[in-house]
Amino acid sequence: MPTVSVKRDLLFQALGRTYTDEEFDELCFEFGLELDEITSEKQIISKEQGHGKAQGASDVVLYKIDVPANRYDLLCLEGLARGLQVFKERIKAPVYKRVMPKGDIQKLVITEETAKVRPFAVAAVLRNIKFTKDRYDSFIELQEKLHQNICRKRALVAIGTHDLDTLSGPFTYTAKRPSDIKFKPLNKTKEYTACELMNIYKTDNHLKHYLHIIESKPLYPVIYDSNGVVLSMPPIINGNHSKITVNTRNIFIECTGTDFTKAKIVLDIIVTMFSEHCENQFTVEAVEVVSPNGKSSTFPELPYRKEMVRADLINKKVGIRETPANLAKLLTRMCLKSEVIGDGNQIEVEIPPTRADVIHACDIVEDAAIAYGYNNIQMTLPKTYTIANQFPLNKLTELLRLDMAAAGFTEALTFALCSQEDIADKLGLDISATKAVHISNPKTAEFQVARTTLLPGLLKTIAANRKMPLPLKLFEISDVVVKDSGKDVGAKNYRHLCAVYYNKTPGFEIIHGLLDRIMQLLDVPPGEESGGYMIKASAGSAFFPGRCAEIFVGGQSIGKLGVLHPDVITKFELTMPCSSLEINIEPFL
């Protein structure tokens, strides 16, 4: 869930009253939000960087509020305050209007060169806006929140905002070779080519995460005005020429991307949130966008649509008994203007452009439940009685866990995600040979892939507990994930059992004995006949030569055991010998 930081006093001013922390926490809960933390800029810096860095930072109280990931209209103070005001029935939800300019309409022309890079673009103008320092900060913060959420870190959509008074339309959205693009980027004092900028931003903590989006493309997207001034090179950086400030009065907003629907949603959210500060409140000036095929469209769309939902459906799904009129009132409090029509059981719900999250009747039902109050819904016994039972795989896991502990091993619970190094380099494998499922744009280097083996997690656990008395005997029974083209999701989970023994001697006999005990518990006899188990000498990059065996049950390989190679032990920052066992337990079901 995204977290929005707002100044407490500024929020209370927008709400028209003050609250105690407990009262505001309760209000957030009623509205489907969560007050995550009460802090200040000084406390945040002190916590993250130390007390020395916090000198001179603001002591203004900040509320950190967790917002549902699909409620883009609540990602800034303006939307949050507006939503709460409507919820408390202090104001009515505003009506957003698109207006045509008094003079010529601004145009954004898209050329065919953008087709293979970022083919879509939409635009709008906020006219006669009045910024304060706080409003300006909120405007920038909203763009960043949208970039991180619906825009998927700018991969799907990138937002550019510009001081229209410094530019001259019509505007052209095209794509050129990096060496042919030269401009002065935001907050820089000299011009650079696109190639030079990509090299400079590789060390920029903020922008380096977005370079991969276009870095390998032969052409880079760029937006010019009629005088050849560069507005932006999406999704990387805006030009410094059209930089907006607190004194900016007219803003040209462009959204480019690979997802047309999301680009329109992002544009609608920005203009609906900040048209509140325009001279003519909640009005947005239209922009004509000309596609490569010559077709013209006008944006923003600001669509209002109507949905029909039956009152008895809402009552049944939520578990309440409310009249259609009361349900319509509840929905109106959630910025969904509603009225009872037809036979008295039908409710017509108007979906505003700020509520792109409402795509189905169930979304309307959910909002009715939130407005009614989850704590007000009476608990009832189900009409049918069922007997719960464990999945066979989970039952087998629980039985084995108990006996592994009885055998003197301690259970560890490790992360399902790990680094590529952990499952490949450190085990002497190439990453391509692991069939690992990779995480797109991982947050940290420690969580790049889903684990294909439980062994690295246990070895890292031992490394973190090296000062504990020897021997260390650990086990884990959990899932690993590998690619599988035969599955609809392209991957499959397998339940593995892994155990390690770490001591001054390898203790292969301990691990071998544990295997025998596991097979005894599973009623699998030794030997090749009658589906028995056996081990055969094998080789593995993670194991010491001549000290590795493959485990077979009924002729099927289920795993390996052996003494780990010294290189593996060293790479996991260990100093003592170690033996391990890892098997797939699903064949025993």
Curated annotation (Swiss-Prot):
Residues of the B5 domain: 302-379
EC number: 6.1.1.20
Cofactor: Mg(2+)
One Pfam family of this chain: B5
Top-tier EC class: ligase
Tree of life domain: Eukaryota
GO molecular function annotation: ATP binding; magnesium ion binding; phenylalanine-tRNA ligase activity; RNA binding
Cellular location(s): Cytoplasm
Listed GO biological process terms: phenylalanyl-tRNA aminoacylation; protein heterotetramerization
GO cellular component term, pick one: phenylalanine-tRNA ligase complex
Keyword entries, A-Z: Aminoacyl-tRNA synthetase, ATP-binding, Cytoplasm, Ligase, Magnesium, Metal-binding, Nucleotide-binding, Protein biosynthesis
Entry-linked CDD domains: PheRS_beta_core
Catalyzed chemical reaction(s): tRNA(Phe) + L-phenylalanine + ATP = L-phenylalanyl-tRNA(Phe) + AMP + diphosphate + H(+)
Gene3D superfamilies the UniProt entry points to: 3.30.56.10, Bira Bifunctional Protein, Domain 2 (3.30.930.10), Phenylalanyl-trna Synthetase, Chain B, domain 3 (3.50.40.10)
Residues binding Mg(2+), per UniProt: 357, 363, 366-367
Quaternary structure, from the entry: Heterotetramer; dimer of two heterodimers formed by FARSA and FARSB.
Family: Belongs to the phenylalanyl-tRNA synthetase beta subunit family. Type 2 subfamily.
PANTHER family, alphabetized: PHENYLALANINE--TRNA LIGASE BETA SUBUNIT, PHENYLALANYL-TRNA SYNTHETASE BETA CHAIN AND LEUCINE-RICH REPEAT-CONTAINING PROTEIN 47
Name of the featured protein: Phenylalanine--tRNA ligase beta subunit
Species annotation: Mus musculus
Gene responsible for this protein: Farsb
